[in-house]
Amino acid sequence: MANRSRVLVTGGAGFIGRRVVRALLTEGHEVTVADLRAFPDPEVRTLVGDLCDPDVATRAVEPGTDVIIHLAAVTSVLASVQDPVATHLLNVDATARLLELCRENEVGTFLLASTNAVVGGGSAPDEVITERTVLRPLTPYGATKAAGEMLLGSYANCYGITGAALRFSNVYGPGMTEKDSFIPRLMRAARDGEGVQVRGDGSMLRDVVHVDDVVQGISAAWRGQHNGPLILGSGQSVTVNEMVTTARKVTGAPIPAENVPVGCGEMPAVVLDISAAKALGYRPAFDLETGMATVWPDFAPEGATP
């Protein structure tokens, strides 16, 4: 991703984090993971603990650290609605503590995993979301991520830290069997011979991006020393109905769909402008069908043909 560096990856044992850590190791960086659980490879140094604990955070950010990639967060909209206080503790308080440790230890770069949910209600059905779209989050998740972005911006402005707020769209890919977002729900439904619930009539537009494209985007932001928000998505919006149809094609399962009312915090549409990331060299490589085909083997019954 850049010259050999000492990198702290918070949330590095998670779905996105594991891919990020592997890429960093391949490029020869010295990596430390801070997470609630150990990294699957025991050779990777892991600090197991809760970053909401000041002692854990202090031990995580060692003198000599060059870069922090902060992926640890409450990432579920539903979980944030159910427990907004816990969401604030991790997404805001822990982020603020890491930024202060970044300042104290003279860490030069801080890459924050954010989300396009920070714009929330600012996205009308015909509006293309850019880095300049007004922040109008609809949920505690979006609000806490917006707060994290503002904290990062203030530290970049006051203390000279290079800080990028990477606004991921809906990330999918191999290794998400424990996730409860829509694509793994489709995969489980195909495996178990069940159906899925589709909120609304299924015509809402969504941008879904493959995890390997996200890793590429993180690298582009780091190499380019990007400051401020940066949208990382596929740049190709699809309807929820198209996602269901593609899952049927990839899995060979019927996956019946039941339409249910739209829930709290649903953005009316997600149509992203990724030109700023492209200017840094970002080139998303996966279309929806190709990407889903990389997810299905993790869920497929033994002997099934992906």
Predicted regions and their residues:
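Flexible, glycine-rich beta-alpha linker
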Residues: V119-G120, T139-P140, A164-S181
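Active-site helix of classical SDR
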Residues: T144-A147
